[in-house]
């Protein structure tokens, strides 16, 4: 079934009205000029409201042109006001196999340090190896008082590292293996010489990576296992948590995934609840990288008890201390 895009924005509706209203006021149409204006108005309506596979025609055209303009991967923009620090999570010492998402989410505002987002990312390979990271993105503007209290030079990176170490300590106290992770310990999603196509990133004829936005709704606890069950060389899944605007108690969530396969991705989503990032794979995969400071697309208010209903896979023992033999080199 062809998915329906979101409700048209004000700009799109305004442009359509600018084309339709003059034609409607000219009724009845009698001259050739009137019919030309009618045809132009019809073309504008189709061009702005028409869609295919959940994307407006104008979005398809814009993304197609963006692919042509991009000659290499988008580099993460350098910034001194945002930083992301990572904590790797290993298997628990006890029999529990449920990652404590509600506990992790409380580190959005902990010990006087407020995180813009917390993201849990897992990478699962075809051999069953699972690795999990928790990323805390800290923004200087949200933490000026805490930063100035530590030093006059605003030590953003050091402050974020403090939050990461405290989270790792907390996880170890309740029985999980955990520790801070260096950026170069994270395997790359995409090879530097990959080429973007409409359906994904192509490295070789047997190496494709496709990005998908995941609907963060009440069905998410069923969607994530369905993604993990899909055959793939690598499966990347990320869940991002943030505070709702103006609130310190309500959460918004967003989710995304990427599948590395040895066949060309199909034109439709492989699992219900996924939206292919057609023509937008480079920006989507750049944001999906655990080291990214960008937010994932699609933040929505978290359904009630969502975090308690989500089952996150348990990493395998020693995975985070193993050499990255299969990691793709980065630029």
UniProtKB/Swiss-Prot annotation:
GO terms for cellular component: plasma membrane. It holds the Pfam family EccE. It is found in: Cell inner membrane. Keywords: Cell inner membrane, Cell membrane, Membrane, Transmembrane, Transmembrane helix, Transport. It is a multi-pass membrane protein. InterPro entries: EccE_dom (IPR050051), T7SS_EccE (IPR021368). The chain crosses the membrane at residues 11-31, 37-57. Part of the ESX-3 / type VII secretion system (T7SS), which is composed of cytosolic and membrane components. The ESX-3 membrane complex is composed of EccB3, EccC3, EccD3 and EccE3. Part of the ESX-3 specialized secretion system, which is important for iron and zinc uptake or homeostasis. Belongs to the EccE family. This is ESX-3 secretion system protein EccE3. It comes from Mycobacterium tuberculosis (strain CDC 1551 / Oshkosh).
């Amino acid at each position: 079934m062809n998915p329906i895009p979101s409700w048209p924005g004000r700009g799109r509706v305004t442009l359509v009205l600018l084309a339709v209203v003059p034609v409607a006021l000219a009724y009845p149409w009698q001259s050739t000029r009137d019919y030309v204006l009618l045809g132009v108005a019809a073309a504008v309506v189709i061009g702005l409201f028409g869609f295919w596979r959940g994307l407006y025609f104008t979005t398809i055209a814009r993304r197609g042109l963006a692919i042509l303009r991009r000659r290499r991967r988008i580099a993460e923009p350098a910034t001194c006001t945002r930083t992301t620090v990572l904590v790797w999570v290993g298997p628990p010492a006890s029999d529990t196999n449920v990652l404590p998402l509600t506990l992790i989410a409380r580190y959005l505002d902990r010990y006087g340090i407020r995180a813009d987002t917390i993201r849990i990312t897992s990478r699962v390979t075809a051999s069953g190896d699972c690795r999990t990271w928790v990323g805390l993105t800290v923004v200087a503007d949200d933490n000026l008082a805490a930063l100035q209290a530590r030093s006059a030079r605003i030590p953003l990176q050091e402050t974020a590292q403090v939050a990461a170490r405290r989270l790792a300590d907390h996880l170890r106290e309740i029985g999980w293996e955990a520790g801070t992770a260096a950026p170069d310990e994270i395997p790359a999603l995409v090879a530097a010489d990959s080429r973007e196509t409409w359906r994904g990133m192509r490295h070789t004829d047997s190496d494709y990576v496709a990005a998908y936005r995941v609907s963060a709704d009440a069905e998410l606890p069923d969607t994530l296992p369905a993604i993990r069950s899909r055959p793939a060389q690598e499966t990347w899944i990320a869940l991002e948590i943030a505070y709702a605007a103006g609130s310190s108690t309500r959460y918004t969530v967003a989710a995304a995934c990427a599948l590395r396969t040895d066949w060309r991705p199909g034109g439709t989503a492989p699992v219900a609840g996924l939206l292919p990032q057609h023509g937008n794979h480079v920006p989507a995969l750049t944001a999906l990288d655990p080291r990214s400071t960008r937010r994932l697309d699609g933040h929505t208010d978290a359904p009630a008890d969502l975090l308690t209903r989500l089952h996150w896979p348990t990493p395998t023992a020693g995975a985070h201390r193993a050499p990255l033999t299969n990691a793709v080199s980065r630029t």
